[in-house]
């Protein structure tokens, strides 16, 4: 993939861009195999590759420059702004949206936040696309509600120019830190969730719910989890750290008793909507802390699926799962190092199969799916 910004040295986010893509995959696989070498993996499956460009469904743009000539992209530590509207990681559909948003910022008088001076209102634009429908969710991250009335008043023009904007919101982030979003979210559009679909499973994305940024690879990851679970012929499972329900909804069947747990109420609302649309009667999603939920339950499902943040599931949950002893644990991880550490603490489990999913091309990061079986 050629990137003009990388060539000029103005953006080096894709640290592995000079490395041939097959070599990237080989290096990631070698890294993963090294981490899991102590665990005697029974079967390694081939790496799931990604498209090398235009694969991201989300843009997180720092807004800088002036209200008349805003820049959308990133800030270097020295305060230098780089416009990334032509970043090759984004699909071509993003370009026209960025063009209109720059005009809109000026029309609405949304002064870009100046980090050095601690002045201005508009900090970030967060743009997410639904690959199913070609529609978008747009979030304005503001320092305060000072410009909210101006934003509302100018929205009809924006919606006329960009009818593909399905969800629009304002997030209030008052802290002078490099934090992407605050707690307060104000929905400005009729719709509050962006509709998506992977493998004929409807999914919904609300402004503050997590969603994978590489739809092609995410769909393959969910489908693989579905296929592995189907082979086990089980009838009960937990989906911990479930997000909007991507894994659980793929694995569920009319006979499956599924409980999905996620701390984000926004994400749980999306998961429940999908389950209702699919007509799943034995599926329950709850907004709770996954570790507290699991350690407070007496019943034992046949399979526990975990998809934790980068820190992993942690010692407390590892200890409890080892004691609870479900037949299977399906572990999806965005940080193989924390997963390998957790696997060491999951006593009496062996790794049946492992597959790497290249969710983040041109970087050292990747996703991995591991199926663990309890030793009798």
UniProtKB/Swiss-Prot annotation:
Whether Cytoplasm counts among this entry's keywords is no
Q: Which UniProt keywords apply?
A: 4Fe-4S, Iron, Iron-sulfur, Metal-binding, Methyltransferase, rRNA processing, S-adenosyl-L-methionine, Transferase
Q: Which reaction does it catalyse?
A: uridine(747) in 23S rRNA + S-adenosyl-L-methionine = 5-methyluridine(747) in 23S rRNA + S-adenosyl-L-homocysteine + H(+)
Which HAMAP family is this protein grouped with? 23SrRNA_methyltr_RlmC
What is the recorded name of this protein?
A: 23S rRNA (uracil(747)-C(5))-methyltransferase RlmC
Q: Which family does it belong to?
A: Belongs to the class I-like SAM-binding methyltransferase superfamily. RNA M5U methyltransferase family. RlmC subfamily.
* Keyword Transferase assigned: yes
Q: Which cysteines are joined by disulfide bonds?
A: none
Source domain of life? Bacteria
Q: Which residues bind S-adenosyl-L-methionine?
A: 212, 241, 262, 307
List its EC numbers. 2.1.1.189
Q: Which residues form the active site?
A: 334 (nucleophile)
Q: Which InterPro entries match?
A: 23SrRNA_MeTrfase_RlmC, MeTrfase_TrmA_AS, MeTrfase_TrmA_CS, SAM-dependent_MTases_sf, U5_MeTrfase_fam
Main role?
Answer: Catalyzes the formation of 5-methyl-uridine at position 747 (m5U747) in 23S rRNA.
**Binding positions for [4Fe-4S] cluster?**
3, 11, 14, 87
């Amino acid at each position: 993939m050629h990137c003009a910004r990388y060539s000029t040295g103005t953006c080096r986010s894709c640290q592995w861009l000079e490395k041939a893509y097959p070599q990237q995959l080989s290096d990631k696989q070698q890294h993963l195999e090294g981490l899991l070498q102590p665990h005697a993996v029974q079967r390694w499956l081939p790496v799931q590759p990604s498209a090398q460009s235009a694969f991201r469904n989300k843009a997180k743009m720092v807004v800088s420059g002036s209200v008349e000539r805003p820049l959308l992209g990133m800030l270097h530590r020295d305060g230098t702004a780089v416009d990334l509207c032509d970043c090759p990681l984004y699909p071509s559909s993003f370009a026209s949206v960025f063009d209109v948003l720059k005009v809109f910022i000026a029309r609405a008088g949304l002064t870009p936040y100046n980090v050095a001076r601690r002045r201005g209102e508009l900090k970030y634009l967060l743009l997410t696309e639904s690959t199913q429908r070609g529609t978008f969710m747009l979030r304005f991250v503001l320092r305060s509600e000072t410009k909210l009335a101006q934003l509302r008043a100018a929205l009809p023009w924006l919606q006329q120019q960009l009818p593909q904007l399905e969800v629009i919101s304002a997030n209030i982030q008052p802290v002078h830190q490099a934090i992407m979003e605050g707690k307060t979210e104000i929905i400005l559009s009729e719709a509050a969730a962006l509709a998506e679909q992977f493998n004929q499973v409807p999914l919904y994305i609300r402004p503050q719910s997590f969603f994978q940024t590489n739809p092609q690879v995410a769909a393959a990851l969910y489908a693989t989890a579905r296929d592995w679970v189907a082979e086990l012929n089980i009838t009960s499972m937990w989906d911990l750290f479930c997000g909007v329900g991507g894994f659980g909804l793929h694995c569920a069947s009319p006979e499956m008793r599924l409980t999905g747990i996620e701390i984000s109420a926004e994400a749980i609302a999306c998961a429940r909507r999908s389950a209702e649309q699919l007509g799943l009667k034995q599926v329950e999603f709850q907004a709770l802390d996954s570790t507290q939920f699991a350690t407070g339950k007496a019943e034992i499902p046949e399979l526990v699926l975990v998809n934790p943040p980068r820190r992993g599931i942690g010692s407390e949950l590892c200890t409890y799962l080892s004691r609870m002893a479900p037949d299977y644990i399906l572990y999806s991880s965005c940080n193989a190092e924390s997963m390998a550490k957790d696997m060491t603490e999951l006593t009496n489990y062996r790794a049946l199969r492992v597959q790497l999913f290249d969710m983040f091309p041109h970087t050292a990061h990747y996703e991995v799916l591991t199926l663990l079986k309890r030793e009798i």
